[in-house]
Amino acid sequence: MNGDWISGGRENLRVLIDYKGSGFPGGQMQDDLLLFSLRPDASPNPLALAVVNFPPIRGKRSLYIHRLSGEAPEDRDVLLDAIEAFARRQGYPVLYLNVMEQEMSYLYSRGFTVSPDCPIAAREVRR
């Protein structure tokens, strides 16, 4: 399915970002999760979804795309662009992505390098 069929044009698409953070009472808040969704206006059904969290990777707090899904590659690309813009503003130098549900050709064509020892791909954030 793509946005043209639902909304009459891709110009009516929006990237929605839902934030979840947590903290102990009186303590500092921490970022737990961002959910990015690409939706046509007035549609409850997303065309693409991405779940982002912030685990330590290689000793540093990192931006990790736990899930990136959507039928059309161009819809996933819209979310990748939004996530990369967020990463750039927040100072994350690398995007990490779980490769378990991804086509390798998609990852390589988007500039990701796949780790040989774990199911993670990485790409430097473009400045």
How does the language model describe each region?
Residues 100-118:
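Conserved active-site alpha-helix within GNAT-family acetyltransferase domains
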Residues 72-85:
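Conserved acetyl-CoA-binding loop-helix of GNAT-fold acetyltransferases
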Residues 30-38, 42-74:
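Conserved donor-binding loop and adjoining core beta-sheet/short helix segment
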Residues 87-99:
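Conserved GNAT acetyl-CoA-binding A-motif
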Residues 117-127:
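STAS-like cytosolic regulatory interaction modules
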Residues 9-37, 41:
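Active-site rim helix/loop that mediates acceptor-substrate recognition in acyltransferases
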Residues 68-69, 98-101:
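Structural motif
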Residues 1-11:
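Short, compositionally biased leader-like segments
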